[in-house]
Amino acid sequence: MAKIAVFFGGSSTEHSISILTGCFICKTLHTMGHSVKPILLTKDGGWVVPSEYRMSIPFEVSNSPDLFQEEFQKRYGVSRTNQIFSLDADIVFLGLHGGQGEDGTIQGFLEILGIPYTGSGVLASAIAMDKTRANQIFLQSGQKVAPFFEIDKLEYLNSTDAVITKLETLGFPQFLKPVEGGSSVSVYKITNREQLKEKLALIFESDSKVMSQSFLTGIEVSCGVLERYRDGKFKKIALPATEIVPGGEFFDFESKYKQGGSHEITPARISEQEMKRVQELAIAAHRSLGCSGYSRTDFIIVNGEPHILETNTLPGMTETSLIPQQAKAAGISMEEVFSDLIEIGLKRSLY
């Protein structure tokens, strides 16, 4: 059995979801017999690093990030950032979402330290987090995406009216979102010019680049991809896609993570041909971005043709997340999924 450090928390807007992911990962690894060291990245950039490998996590308050951090620090002391440089882990299991946890920053840090980790490498993580760059790669690979524009803050400040007029050519409704972000945080469905101006100003308060994309009507599905090492070869498999029926206007943060926020159906209620096509495209997206270990790609099926919405390199791994749902539908246990992720991470570190 391995000594595994689990990174979770972080300073992104997805901190609370990462805590739930981290708790689920720690529980699962513990049942598998691994030595687990939960390492909490605090909202203000600190690290709470236990001195020993022992499973003591305040699961009972995992739904309250502030209380969770308080209880976690009671057990393990204050932030010990310096201890991360002498981390004695066989591998780091990444349970982070968004921001520096998913954009290649943490991955690069671990590369410098020479510590193997789960999931995609620096380049794939950075590209997938940048929605504009990812869409450009998808288009170059012959895949379909909704029409889009990227606007940077300086362009907006210098030519606000021109920017608004440009974005209006996408038509209404359209989706406005930060170029770098996840879990549909700060994603807005825009229906008119005034709302466009209002939400652009709001997003630019905390982000430097915005992408607006035409609204497509269709069936929303999401498909996970797992990598495995079998018979001396690396293999990629696509899981059964999940159909997303949002409780609101679209599959936003509330729909994803609040109880009753959306209705998720696995396998999706689509034709066999559509399912096969979605799975093929999910693997193609994974390959195009250079992902490793696992990924999850969201689609919208318009008149039988899937269009890519985005690819997540560190998809949610809470008890209600899509990857666990899809793995179960495929007859794959989460213990097997985690074993494969660990094996892929360790083997990749050798090259």
Swiss-Prot record:
GO terms for cellular component: cytoplasm. One of its GO terms (molecular function) is ATP binding. Binds 2 magnesium or manganese ions per subunit. Pfam families: Dala_Dala_lig_C, Dala_Dala_lig_N. It comes from the Bacteria. PROSITE patterns: ATP_GRASP, DALA_DALA_LIGASE_1, DALA_DALA_LIGASE_2. This is D-alanine--D-alanine ligase. Residues 135-343 form the ATP-grasp domain. InterPro entries: ATP-grasp (IPR011761), ATP_grasp_subdomain_1 (IPR013815), D-Ala_lig_Van_CS (IPR000291), D_ala_D_ala (IPR005905), Dala_Dala_lig_C (IPR011095), Dala_Dala_lig_N (IPR011127), PreATP-grasp_dom_sf (IPR016185). Its cofactor is Mg(2+); Mn(2+). It is found in: Cytoplasm. Mg(2+) 2 binds at E310, N312. Coiled coil: none annotated. GO terms for biological process: cell wall organization; peptidoglycan biosynthetic process; regulation of cell shape. Its EC number is 6.3.2.4. It catalyses: 2 D-alanine + ATP = D-alanyl-D-alanine + ADP + phosphate + H(+). Keywords: ATP-binding, Cell shape, Cell wall biogenesis/degradation, Cytoplasm, Ligase, Magnesium, Manganese, Metal-binding, Nucleotide-binding, Peptidoglycan synthesis. ATP binds at residues 167-222. Mg(2+) 1 binds at D298, E310.
